[in-house]
């Protein structure tokens, strides 16, 4: 389930973050982004941290 992030989270994570993550960091391809933001492409396999 993906929810709209706050403005600060938007700057960090990109457009969406994964609901239920304690650090509120977005995930790309099932892995948390530790730097940059999550770029959601067309299809989960193409999600990348940028």
Curated annotation (Swiss-Prot):
InterPro entries the record matches: Ornatin (IPR002463)
Chain ranges for the short sequence motif Cell attachment site as given in the UniProt record: 42-44
Keyword Ribonucleoprotein: no
UniProt main location, coarse: secreted
Keywords from the named record: Cell adhesion, Secreted
Domain of life: Eukaryota
UniProt GO cellular component terms: extracellular region
Subcellular location: Secreted
GO biological process terms, semicolon-separated: cell adhesion; regulation of blood coagulation
Cited Pfam families: Ornatin
Known function: Potent inhibitor of fibrinogen interaction with platelet receptors expressed on glycoprotein IIb-IIIa complex. May prevent blood from clotting during either feeding and/or storage of ingested blood.
Similarity comment: Belongs to the ornatin family.
Name of the protein: Ornatin-E
Organism: Placobdella ornata
Lineage of the organism: Eukaryota, Metazoa, Spiralia, Lophotrochozoa, Annelida
